[in-house]
Amino acid sequence: MRPLLLQVGIRNVNIGERVTCVEPCNLYECTIGDDSFVGPFVEIQRGVIIGKRCRIQSHSFICEKVSISDDCFIGHGVMFVNDLFKQGGPSGNAESWKSTHIGNQVSIGSNATILPVQITNQVVIGAGAVVTKDITEPGFYAGNPAKKIRSLPK
């Protein structure tokens, strides 16, 4: 029996002006706004919307049902999750998946994990943080689970 080899690369992507994508990457059926950057070894799945002037660093995974607004930074190895494994394992039913929305001017540090949440504008997420709940006010957040550790400077 021959193996099934799926090669995706960059397929059916709505790419804005002056976007840089470094291969190898796996981008399909998503939207990437003007002046954005996507590093190598990044996967961005169908339906994802990336705003303008965003930087997605290497080895990040952005799953279906994620939207990222303008002027955001996604550090190396950041993982977005849309399935909470409520049945003890992955759900093949996309209707049970949850969405994530990232506001404007959000920076997410390397190796953070973002569960299905809403994050407001002007937030910094520390490296390695696990965001399990909505973030409704600007500031610096870190830890597992992520908690506000200080406000942004005025």
What residue spans do the PLM features occupy?
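Conserved N-terminal strand/loop that marks the beginning of ABC ATPase nucleotide-binding domains
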Residues: N14-I15
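Short glycine/proline-enriched turn or capping motifs at secondary-structure junctions
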Residues: K133-P145
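Conserved catalytic segment of ABC-fold P-loop ATPases
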Residues: T120-V123, T136-P138
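Flexible, glycine/small-residue-enriched loop-and-beta-strand segment within the central core
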Residues: R2-R11, C21-I32, S36-I119, N144-P145, ...
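C-terminal/domain-terminus segments
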Residues: V124-V131, F140
